[in-house]
Amino acid sequence: MNRRKTTSRGTSAAMKISHQPPRLLIVNIAVPSWVDICPNLCEALQNFFSIACSLMGPSRMSLFSLYTVQNQHECVLPFVQVRGNFIRLQACISELRMLQVEGCHRPPHALLPLAIEDGLQQFKQYSSHMASSAAQPWTSLEITVLTSRPGKEVVKELEEGLKDINLLSVRRLQVAEVTKGIQERSDSPSPTEEPSNDESSILEADIVLETLDNDVVSMEVFFKAWLHNSETDQENIHLLLTPQSLPPPSRAKDHPICLKCDLQERFLSPSLLPGTADGVSRIDDPKGDISTLYQMASLASASPYKLQVVKALKSSGICESLTYGLPFILRPTSCWQLDWDELETNQQHFHALCHCLLKRDWLLLARGEPLIHKHNQSLPACSFYVITPSHSLTLLVKLVATRELMLPGFFPLLSEDPPEDSLKIIESTLDSLDLGLTYNPLHVGSHLYSHLSSAHAKPQGRLYTSCASRGLRKGGQLQTNRVRAAVVPLPVAPAPRRALKMTAASKASSAAFLPSDSEEGEEERPSHT
């Protein structure tokens, strides 16, 4: 993708986690595939939002809006706050699920660009309305078009239809083509990303084409990518390699190596979700384990958080019982402020480090450089991390215990074989177990989705009543008087009676500018267990 500097990039690193871009999802409905896609899509969306609406700590997803495009484009859900709004999002998903029995026709080619233009207009009006009350206004959004049509055909349609549209407020425009076949899933199935053709350079925003399997798990993984920190204003971590960490030539003392890295979570901390962690009360900060390395890296606004490598270790030289907290992934930075040569050199050095560590069977022990404030004269405590290489272009980082944290313990080695009778009983029991080659977390469910959904299901008669009334259809036709967007949707063609409905529609839609009571309460209420 082309690296542009047209959108606002002034966000401080302290806001990286909490100021994620709004999301606009446009579902391009077409028969006959919609009948197969709809159940999987709706289940994946419900599972995703049960997590996204429940997460404590910094907000990972600010606003969300949903459009559908079939024989016309329609705003099913205007931009709303995600946190604390599960009931409203669930009603939207229920409405989306009903579309599978309405008889969908192949949408006209002009409707997708119209839906994007309509969503942009709604976003701009919402942003300008909320600019005075928001701590930091939203200046850009990400748009996803979900379709079962050939992806390249949709990309070409968007390139043609959007060439005269101002897309400076679009941070990313992606087309996700849902395929009918289900490919074999690995540990973390990820969508296949393809750049669009050269003609997309005429647009002010690049179009990214991805393919997505038509199953619930793949769609969940696709939507959960929205929870990642997507800011590229500044690299998160500086990994400092001292001469003692890797034995380079003697002249390396004059050329210290600093690898610039971005930080990525491997999974969500259970402490960020209500009713998890096996019922044990959390004595840590409500933000959970994210308050360690991830939070330190985000709060280092003046400069990236530094990890100073102290020494190398043999991979068998550390006991797993000494590591704690959430693991994190280090990868070469994609910071937009670095020039291409520096980015390429940094990635090559990172690749070489992974290769050398694997070849030598080494780990790295690193010290987190504390953030020393001028007004604090005492030396702050620091944390130590063990860094493990992988066969991909990533490093695994885990906290490791230090002397101050250790408790006495003596664990003698097994000195002799166990009694023969006990050995036979245990061996027979073990032989009855299923043996798997690997652990795949995507095949193991903990009923967390249903638990979180039930926790959100509180009686709200007014909302359910309005949802049910919106879902009614008359004579198999769509309701033409249903307008819930923050702006009046763009017409496909001029209609004589349209002007008569504009005033009423504008009044009805103005309420969408204001957050609901639950949204306001959620913003003001501090996170707690």
From Swiss-Prot:
GO biological process: cell differentiation; chromatin organization; female gamete generation; male meiosis chromosome separation; meiosis I; RNA processing; spermatogenesis
Stored InterPro entries: M1AP
Keywords: Cytoplasm, Differentiation, Phosphoprotein, Spermatogenesis
GO molecular function, one term: identical protein binding
Superkingdom of the organism of origin: Eukaryota
UniProt subcellular location: Cytoplasm
GO cellular component: cytoplasm; membrane
Disruption-associated phenotype: Males show reduced testicular size and a tubular defects, which led to severe oligozoospermia and infertility. Spermatocytes are eliminated via apoptosis either at the pachytene checkpoint, or later at the spindle checkpoint during metaphase I.
Biased composition (Polar residues): 188-200
Tissues with expression: Expressed in germ cells of the testis. Expressed from spermatogonia to spermatids. Expressed at very low levels in lung, stomach, thymus. Not detected in Sertoli cells.
Primary localisation category: cytoplasm
Modified residue annotations for Phosphoserine: 516
Region (Disordered): 180-201, 504-529
Function: Required for meiosis I progression during spermatogenesis.
Remarks, miscellaneous: Seems to synergize with Cbfb and Myh11 during the onset of acute myeloid leukemia.
Protein name: Meiosis 1 arrest protein
Organism: Mus musculus
Gene that produces this protein: M1ap
